Amino acid sequence: MSDQPKMIYLPETMANWPWPRYINPHYEEVKAESDAWFKGFKPFTKQSQVAFDKCDFGRLASLAYPWASKEHLRTGCDLMNVFFMIDEYTDVECASVVRGMVDIVIDVINNPHKPRPEGESLLGEITRQFWERAIKAATPSSQKHFIEAFTDYLNSVVEQAADRDNNHIRTVDSYLKTRRENIGARPSYFPAELGLNLPDEAFYHPVVTELSYNIAELIILDNDIASYNKEQATGDDRHNILTIVMLQFNIDLEAAMTWVASYHKDVENKFLDGMKKLPSFGPVVDKELEEYILALAIWPRTNDCWNFESGRYFGSKGLQVQKTRYVPLLPKVKTDPTLKQKQVVVSLVDL
């Protein structure tokens, strides 16, 4: 018997994506400000905060909003910290508890100046401060679109918790439909829309909506390829396209990777074709819409680069894995399901 760990091959899905990597020049300064604000709440244990910091969510925001001003980038950095805190806090809870958390956050974004009650989950005050600061620099239309997208995202997090409670594994189509919301892509477009005045007729036009969902799917596929190893190790891989494809088509992991890479190519082509079908709404709106579509188009590259540049999925070996495309299968680890909220365990990956 060989002691060598099994190696997983990660297909190079982004090789032909036309948009390159950009990063905001204000990255280090704004990340430091946002992280200092976030850590001031002491949302995690010392050990989990170290693991959270290695994820470098400020880098994710700086890759996603490379042309943003310092003020707008701060909104992006704060939002990424809020997103992943929601992710960590809700991943270990049952649907009824998640519903309660989500209702707090929905109340916050609709009432950002309302003081939060004593003893409420930290999610309330952290989200309130993020949103109160964000709206100072956001157009009314971008605020409205964010509230709608963030509410859809939050409700889908409850759905994911119900699936977890019932040990329910979806079909590919059903998974992608719900995951398009709970990957958090739509609200993540908001920091790029902060200064735009896109009317609903343009923002919610079927072609634009479809393009935004194409991008969400590309993010899902690349996220699930990168996160599968960590998730199978911690026993949290039911909500992953690779697990679903393996079960639905009765194939192994290698064949599932090939299937996902092929589907990724199809979605890329849908997006590129869809861009040619954008209607005109007049010169002023068209210029803003072009800026918004560019913000969507760079997200898959952002996500792919961050998967390897941060320590979230590959520890300190991300850039090496990005080159070789091979990663050793991590051994199974036990996490303590009784540790919640501030005590939640944020897993540290070490390949």
Curated annotation (Swiss-Prot):
- Where's the motif NSE/DTE motif? 223-231
Q: Give the record's keywords alphabetically.
A: Lyase, Magnesium, Metal-binding
Specify the superkingdom.
Eukaryota
Record bears the keyword Metal-binding: yes
Question: Between which residues do disulfide bridges form?
Answer: none
Catalytic reaction equation(s)? (2E,6E)-farnesyl diphosphate = pentalenene + diphosphate
Could you say which residues bind (2E,6E)-farnesyl diphosphate here?
Answer: 312-313
Q: Which InterPro entries match?
A: Isoprenoid_synthase_dom_sf (IPR008949), Terpene_cyclase-like_2 (IPR034686)
Q: Which family is this sequence assigned to? A: Belongs to the terpene synthase family.
Q: Which PANTHER family match?
A: BETA-PINACENE SYNTHASE-RELATED, TERPENE SYNTHASE
This protein is called Sesquiterpene synthase 14
Species in which this protein is naturally found: Postia placenta (strain ATCC 44394 / Madison 698-R)
